[in-house]
């Protein structure tokens, strides 16, 4: 009986294992006077509360620590500031250590780490240091490969020698030596002539040296008075270098003749008048034609194409507003297309080596006319028109290729002075000084030019004659010259 009485008490004092309802709690309160407490849920709740407080405290600590740090960047971007630790075996340890060091150190300091393996340093390319403190570089394998490719391309594109072809270098050396030899020979002859003029100078001359100084106009900057003599000295040396062959019709050409060349040039004179081109364009056009024919065989069907292409090139070089390619095609009645003209243009330019600046007869005629007009014995304007007319007559005649442009210009001035005034010798010390020729040096050319001047009936090519028969040129084409005596060349 005693055991039976103690069991209910023990059972009642024990903590219930299940959930306590309101009825059970009221019964226990009435029986024992208190409600039994549940210890296990309370301990669990306290543990959860303690754990929750621990986690929140850790987060608050990290947040406060990150707020106090001056660098707002995440840890990983700060670690990659030093690129030498990429791909290392101890990267995780190094990251933690480096982040702590960078937070404590100044922003301008850099933490260098030594990689644990040698392969790490080999894979990472060298990068320049960051320009701003606190910046970082993120490099992967693709960027490393691209950097290596760029370095290889840069090495491959490094310039080598300017002349890799030894043959090209030798040709240029030959041409340079030929040019220098021509210049040296000409300058030696010019110096000898100057010494001779100084020895034969007369005290009554205006300059005291036997000739009139035509370069004393220092007020006109376009005349280049201070170095005009040096300019024309170099031009006379340059005309010896790039000049056409005087026998290319006999030596090279088989399908064209001298007459075809004359017809082409006569037609080009009309074209230049139609488009109002300057005389320098016409002279350069014919120079390009003769230089090209001196090197290349051409068929007669392509001769007119060469003519308009040469005038196109000369127009681009001399004119302010050059005619278009379509206009040159139009004047040939569209015999040649634009593509054919452009193709021929490239062929001519490459054959000339793009050397278009050559002294022509017109170049020297300006200088020699200025020297001839210094005496003022003949009208200056008429003398200029007549000398230009005689010089242009030589463009059509193939036989005048054997004379230098300066010789033709000097001969035109000689014959023009003789045609307008027979009372005086047409050659004097001033012309001899500025042309570098004596009257005996140009005798053959002057005689050939006079025959060309009088040959009006047998020549069907009258474009130049009709041009200078106009009133604006004072009809100088109608003038003739008397016989040339031998005394004029002594």
UniProtKB/Swiss-Prot annotation:
Gene Ontology CC terms, in alphabetical order: cyclin-dependent protein kinase holoenzyme complex; cytoplasm; nucleus
Region (Disordered): 34-76
One Pfam family, short name: Cyclin_C
SUPFAM superfamilies xrefs: Cyclin-like
Bilayer-spanning residue ranges: none
A GO molecular function held by the record: cyclin-dependent protein serine/threonine kinase regulator activity
Record bears the keyword Electron transport: no
Keywords: Cell cycle, Cell division, Cyclin
Gene Ontology process terms (BP): cell division; G1/S transition of mitotic cell cycle
Family: Belongs to the cyclin family. Cyclin AB subfamily.
This protein's name: Cyclin-A2-1
